[in-house]
Regions:
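Gly/Ala-rich phosphate-binding loop of Rossmann-like dinucleotide-binding domains
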Residues: 58, 159, 268
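Short, conserved aromatic-histidine micro-motifs
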Residues: 30-37, 75-76, 141, 278-291
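Ribokinase/PfkB-type carbohydrate-kinase core domain
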Residues: 1-20, 42, 63-65, 79-97, ...
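Conserved phosphate-binding/catalytic region of the ribokinase-like
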Residues: 206-305
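Glycine-rich phosphate/adenosyl-contacting loop at the front of the ribokinase-like
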Residues: 1-65, 76, 249
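Alpha-helical transmembrane segments within multi-pass membrane transporters and channels
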Residues: 69-71
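A broad detector of short, well-ordered amphipathic alpha-helices
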Residues: 52-55, 186, 196, 274-278, ...
Length: 305
């Protein structure tokens, strides 16, 4: 059955600087910083958490429905999503804004300078979660990083519609205070964060992971640990789900989104959270072997038994 993917759609512009930032930036002159970097390589990727999650979930055989916002330059992205067979009926096109864009410069030491323009993501809350009367087939959902208002509103709307969802605050976690996090976690069925985000979330809500995992109505809390796998917390108990060795490590962009697609695929089918997380680990290891968040290809065998 369909899964509602609430999150961002963005263009990622990725460049590489063959030198070192440290050799170009003088610490004693940072108050008058004015630098320019020659970047011989440039690539533009389809990105955004909603797009990345939907891309992988569709390859798994899922039925993602994207709820997100594109700007006046998003026509090509919308057409691509549709060419992949993705349901874009809930995508908002905002003519007064550009599509969200992330611009990254990476130096020879893998240090990064990133600029992010939210664009249409800032008005993503204008798109609304369908009510049961409008669409009764939505079996599961996810609140992935998006505009702050969109994440808050869509969580409330999914909860009101009776759609069980994963709360995946990601890089937007600092945008919410402790009371807001407690409110959204209280509406969610599952929470997914990385280890750094887990520490920050616990600090914000004022409790540890065992206590947070006992939140009434919460069926599980997943903490990803990169190559080490992930921890699955349920009612105060934790299970370590081992990581999967990647064939090659090329680009971590979108690995977390691929993992979350695995969670959605398994949970929608009634799998245990541990089994769903194991699929997520396999997908993350596969994704890291390709560049960009939407260029990897899946073999049917990755789903397993």
């Amino acid at each position: 059955m369909p899964a509602l993917i609430c999150g961002s759609l963005a263009f990622d512009t990725i460049t590489n600087f063959p030198g070192r930032f440290a050799q170009q930036i003088l610490p004693e002159q940072v108050h008058i910083l004015n630098v320019s970097f020659l970047v011989p390589t440039l690539r533009r990727e389809w990105g955004g958490c909603a797009g990345n999650i939907a891309y992988t979930l569709k390859q798994l055989g899922g039925e993602p429905v994207i709820l997100a916002a594109l700007g006046n330059d998003g026509g090509e992205y919308l057409a691509r999503l549709q060419s992949l067979g993705l349901d874009t009926s809930q995508v908002l096109v905002e003519p007064a804004e550009h599509t969200a864009q992330c611009m990254i410069i990476t130096d020879a030491d893998n240090n990064q300078i990133t600029a992010f323009h939210p664009g249409a993501m800032s008005v993503a809350h204008h798109a609304r979660v369908p009510t049961p009367a409008q669409r009764a087939d939505l079996a599961i959902g996810i609140i992935a990083p998006d505009g702050r208002e969109a994440m808050r509103d869509h969580a409330h709307q999914m909860h009101a519609a009776g759609i069980p969802f994963i709360f995946d605050p990601g890089q937007q976690l600092p945008q919410f205070d402790g009371a807001e996090h407690r409110e959204i976690v209280g509406m969610a069925r599952w929470v997914a964060v990385n280890d750094y985000e887990a520490r920050m979330l616990c600090e914000r809500v004022g409790c540890d992971l065992p206590t947070l995992s006992r939140t009434p109505g919460l069926e599980g809390l997943v903490v990803t640990l990169a190559a080490e796998g992930c921890d699955v917390w349920q009612r105060g108990e934790v299970v370590r789900v081992p990581g999967v060795v990647a064939r090659e490590v090329l680009d971590p962009t979108g690995c977390g989104d691929a993992f979350r697609a695995g969670l959605l695929y398994g949970l929608e089918r009634g799998w245990t959270l541990v089994r769903s997380a194991a699929l997520g680990n396999r997908l993350g290891a596969l994704k890291i072997s390709s560049r960009g968040g939407q260029n990897h290809r899946l073999e049917p065998s990755i789903v397993g038994n």
